[in-house]
A protein has these predicted regions:
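Single conserved hydrophobic/aromatic residue that forms the stacking wall/gate
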Residues: 1-15, 279-288
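ATPase nucleotide-binding modules
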Residues: 244-281, 288
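The feature captures the beta-strand-to-loop junction immediately N-terminal to the Walker
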Residues: 53-55
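Helix-to-loop junction immediately C-terminal to a conserved catalytic motif
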Residues: 68
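Conserved coupling/switch loops of ABC nucleotide-binding domains, chiefly the family-specific signature
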Residues: 74-77, 127, 227, 261
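ABC ATPase nucleotide-binding domains
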Residues: 92-96, 100-247, 251
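Conserved ABC transporter NBD signature motif
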Residues: 76-84
């Protein structure tokens, strides 16, 4: 619905006046003696779509939970809208989160699920109905409002989960691997919808995934993580064409980039790359 889309877009444009960035400074997190995040520094421009990408156990979901206020930090600060929210409760951070498991209440219908957060915040009935109408039309779930989650497809459930976040008009959207439970065809469709959503609303998004295709197609920026450290934070094009280190070069792409060990030498104003490939006798026999 074009009018619903324009209405929501206007709301988010008004919200973004004066909004700066999400800024993370020198952030560290330990679980006991295990260091999960190490001196993370990250700044996200308003309206950007940042994807946190990395292998399992790299710390990306922990970082997202810290932004949401679901995890405490050992060192550093988190700023939203120029305010230090490091010790602010999740409900007071003006963020909305979409989970991998949808996290819909099975006993509630779509309408009740979408407006639950607004009712908890004691928003007026008129405002609730206004937001519900706009968002449900925008996400094309307005015909599903009386259905229970068990009566919806995976894609419909994901749209409802996104709608529940949208009605709150948050400063920042946090997505925690929202498409990983969907089949391949539906993942492609939902990627397209999330991309369209961001292009129309221009909201600030932090999105966690281990799927490179998702990251490259959705993000305006990608922060690649490994062992609790951001290896590179750049545009998808630069991540792919100009990796900052061998981990990024080997991690991105299928097949990954070929890496050859060698030495750079300068002599007589010329630079040469010298390498020596050594083979075992078995490998040499195979080559013959």
């Amino acid at each position: 619905d074009d009018s619903a889309s324009r209405g929501l877009g206007d709301v988010y444009k008004r919200q973004r006046i004066g909004m700066k960035t999400l800024k993370i400074e020198e952030l560290s997190k330990n679980f006991g003696s295990t260091e999960v995040l190490r001196k993370i520094n990250l700044e996200i421009d308003e309206g950007n779509f940042l994807v946190l990408l990395g292998p399992s156990g790299c710390g990306k979901s922990t970082l997202l939970n810290i932004i949401a206020g679901l995890e405490t930090i050992n060192e550093g600060n988190v700023h939203i809208d120029d305010y230090n929210v490091s010790k602010v409760e999740p409900k007071d951070r003006n963020i909305a989160m979409v989970f991998q498991s949808y996290a819909l209440y099975p006993s509630m219908n779509v309408r009740e699920n979408m407006i639950f957060g607004l009712k908890q915040a004691k928003v007026s009935k008129e405002k609730i109905e206004e937001q519900l109408e706009k968002v449900s039309k925008f996400l094309q779930v307005d015909a599903l409002l009386e259905r229970k989650p068990s009566q919806l497809s995976g894609g419909q459930r994901q749209r409802v989960a996104i709608g529940r976040a949208l009605v709150r008009e948050p400063r920042i959207f946090l997505f925690d691997e929202p498409l990983s439970n969907l089949d391949a065809k539906l993942r492609v469709e939902m990627r397209r919808e999330i991309k369209k959503l961001h292009q129309q609303l221009k909201t600030t998004v932090v999105y966690v995934t281990h799927d490179q295709t998702e990251a490259m197609s959705l993000g305006t920026n990608i922060a690649i993580m490994n062992h609790g450290v951001i290896q590179q934070n750049d545009t998808p094009e630069n991540i792919y064409n100009k990796p900052s280190n061998t981990f990024v070069a080997d991690f991105i792409g299928s097949p990954s980039m070929n890496l050859i060990k060698g030495n750079l030498k300068e002599s007589s104003n010329k630079v040469s790359f010298n390498t020596c490939l050594l083979y075992t006798s078995d490998a040499a026999d195979e080559r013959r």
